[in-house]
């Protein structure tokens, strides 16, 4: 399952959440507000503290940058991809 590390008020995170909803993709949300344990862990684990962060464990992908994430989601899970798999 896709995982999204994000925080509520971030416009870049909102953009990715909208794309996930538009494509009707299930994902696990990891809210990571300032001062949270998840945010601290993420900085140590990934070595970078940038949001949003999309993790696609099936494809071993860790991705920052909302535009890159949205393009990846569209290319990998977009409507044409879903229809061809049915």
Where are these regions (language model features)?
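GST-like domain detector, emphasizing the conserved glutathione-binding G-site
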Residues: 1-8, 14-86
């Amino acid at each position: 399952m896709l995982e999204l590390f994000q925080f509520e008020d971030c416009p870049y995170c909102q953009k990715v959440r909208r794309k996930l909803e538009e494509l009707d993709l299930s994902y696990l949300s990891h809210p990571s507000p300032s001062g949270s344990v998840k945010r601290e862990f993420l900085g140590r684990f990934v070595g970078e503290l940038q949001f949003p962060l999309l993790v696609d464990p099936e494809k071993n992908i860790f991705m920052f940058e909302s535009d890159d994430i949205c393009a990846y989601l569209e290319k990998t899970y977009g409507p044409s991809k879903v229809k061809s798999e049915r």
